[in-house]
UniProtKB/Swiss-Prot annotation:
Region spans: Disordered: 718-773, 825-875
Gene giving rise to this polypeptide: Ppp4r4
Coiled-coil regions listed: 686-730
Main location: cytoplasm
Transcription found in the keyword field: no
PROSITE patterns for this protein: HEAT_REPEAT
Comp. bias regions, Basic and acidic residues: 718-739
PANTHER family listed in its UniProt record: PROTEIN PHOSPHATASE 4 REGULATORY SUBUNIT 4 PPP4R4, SERINE_THREONINE-PROTEIN PHOSPHATASE 4 REGULATORY SUBUNIT 4
Key words, A-Z: Coiled coil, Cytoplasm, Phosphoprotein, Repeat
Annotated localization: Cytoplasm
Extent of Basic residues compositional bias: 866-875
Protein name: Serine/threonine-protein phosphatase 4 regulatory subunit 4
Domain of life, per lineage: Eukaryota
Amino acid sequence: MHPPPPDAGVAMDFGQNSLFGYMEDLQELTIIERPVRRSLKTPEEIERLTVDEDLSDIDRAVYLLSAGQDVQGASVIANLPFLMRQNPTETLRRVLPKVREVLHVASVEMQLTAAVSFLTILQEESMSVHTCAHSFLQVILLHLEHRDTGVSNAWLETLLSAVELLPKETLRHEILNPLVSKAQLSQTVQSRLVSCKILGKITNKFDAHSIKREILPLVKSLCQDVEYEVRSCMCRQLENIAQGIGAELTKNVVLPELIELSRDESGSVRLAAFETLVNMLDMFDTDDRSQTILPLVKSFCEKSFKADESILISLSFHLGKLCHGLYGIFTPDQHLRFLEFYKKLCTLGLQQENGHNESQIPSQIVEQEKKYTSVRKNCAYNFPAMIVFVDPKNFHMELYSTFFCLCHDPEVPVRHTIAICFYEVSKLLNSGVHLIHKELITLLQDESLEVLDALINHLPEILELMSTGGENSVQENKFSSVPDLIPALTAAEQRAAASLKWRTHEKLLQKYTCLPHIISSDQIYYRFLQRMFTIMMTNNVLPVQRAAARTLCIFLRYNRKQEQRHEVIQKLIEQLGQGKSYWNRLRFLDTCEFIIEIFSRSFFCKYFFLPVIELTHDPVANVRMKLCYLLPKVKSALKIPADMHLLQQLEMCVRKLLCQEKDKDVLAIVKKTVLELDRMEMSMDMFQKKNYEKDLLDQEKEREELLFLEMEQLEKEKHQSDGRLASDKSFEKKRRDSRTSTQSLSKNLPISVPGPSSSTASTSKEIKKSKLTRSQSFNNQAFHAKYGTLDKCASKSSTLAHTSSVSGLVRTAMLSLTDDSFRTRNASSVPASFSPNPVMPSTSRGPGNTADPKSSGSKDAQPRKATLKSRKSNP
């Protein structure tokens, strides 16, 4: 055994003493512990706060204002608008006098509450002008000069709202006449500030003569006040005063005051004068702008860099207005200098040598950087105006480098602002939009999601401009000059998906629906469509999953290859509709809802009707419940009599749900759904007046789907014919070489060449070319759920019907040709993608009128029934 360590007993004694010491401390804490009150109020306080329940609202308000506590009085004042709506007469007679008494000694909180209540009453305009003047105006005027600035400003806002309701004479006697004394130097600064704001508000209520005689002397006096705060406040009201006195008095009275204030010793006054001048540019004629205002603006620009940086932020913000207001006045030299000044502001703070000044403390450096960032942000905001200023034709030479700097600015607010303006810049550049392709990629790849969120607000419009704005744009490869577009779009989506900002991710997926306009269906299929599947299967945010589902349906709608369409449909049914996770089956129902909205009725019934109906046997109640909500839309996709067998299957499934459903919530929804289904009117094969527009839209969708399939076949034939044409050309060349020796003889002898005539061949080529052109132009058509007005749809339908009839006649006439590829075709042939597929479950349309375009897709006498794969679902 090892001997015990030395001083072990001492250590033990020390631990025991410490333990006993802690226990004594706890006992002392127990002794000094005070009992906790079980109630916030004593019985006496509760008694004082208790009010008789039988009192009316008016009586209760009077009682609480007279004998209640402050919190009860504040509650009554906050409830004053309700009392005015309920019983205005008694409120004015009994409650309002009590409110006046309370406000004399009220706290700041109660004063603010009263100002808000009075403002609400005035904005509702529920009382006469006489009542407003005699009952409320005096109370408002009495508290305008409250010692608390917040209370005074609240009552001032209420008064300015009351000015709009009061007649001229009331304003003159109750407000304007007292202002003569309130605006004197002997009054407080707060009183004079209030006078400035009131003068700016009431000017528009009087004629020019009254303004000149009664108001302008007060305005001049306040513009020359000894306090810079008063001068600045009055300066900002000169714009409102100028609107009331006309151009002549503005030029003779207001403009000289502004010029004098622009040279004031106080920077805040000079800033107010500059901003007022910018806002009033439209009120001055060309001479005043060129001879008076332009030199002032030039002086402001020079001083802002030399001695007065406080004006830089305001100057950069108002550059757009200055460009617009002074357009056409600049000389070429002044134009160039102003442009250089703008460029300098765009890079302010980015080109400092050796960092900051050593004499500056860190807080000053931070403030200066914030100021410079605000300046560059304002420059980004005004960039579209500067494009107009230099002319879009000169963008590349004058402003492209500046635009590049703004898009690569190190501060997020600057890049965020230029991203907001990107669409405006694209519109202004028009055919020169290709110049900013790289900047679009840069902003799409920006590390900040705020920048991406701002850019994608108008992403479809931007991409559309870029795809059609260039002179060398090609339909199938519009962005060949920007190979990084697709990687940038996919990277932006992945970056949004990895963040917590799911709303940005949802918005981006919604904007992806424009891609069929922009890039080929193969690019969408391989780079985007599979990603939509992944999001639907793995993402945890429901709005994001639904956005991905709708975008996937749009991609499927405009996919140009039959094999790819079948693969997508099969994956939807097998991985979602028959998926093991009930969450995937719910998303399948969401997808079917979008398919009903986007595709034609025949498409839904052919591919998705049976998989949807099969979910009535789903083991999870939530799936069956969601299916019940979808059943009315499923029924609306059926047409009678072609889909009578589908309607019978639907009714059979509903009856089974009614008889076999055990979940009470699902059963309740089933009963409601049955009532809704019974009230629905079925669509007929022939157009009806009630559903004429819907039927016409559906027919348009179906014809577009059929035409897509036809165009795919024609494109295949075109590729085959191009190959044959190349071989025919080589053969023809050899034949001509071999017959060179007998050329003179052949000119005199008729030559008969078997095969189609040149006119017939050229006709068939023209037909194919026109159809291919029409196919390629489909991606430029709008493909939202609502395709437009009835007139547009009618015109489209008539055009397509005429085209179909012409193509049918041409194909019939071409049956006699020797070409095997045309001999096998028939005018009533069924498109390939609408033929039965043994892999995917589909529902054939029932027999109907052969003239109907829907029934022409199938000639089966009996409806084909497809069995779905049995599956076991794990809830």
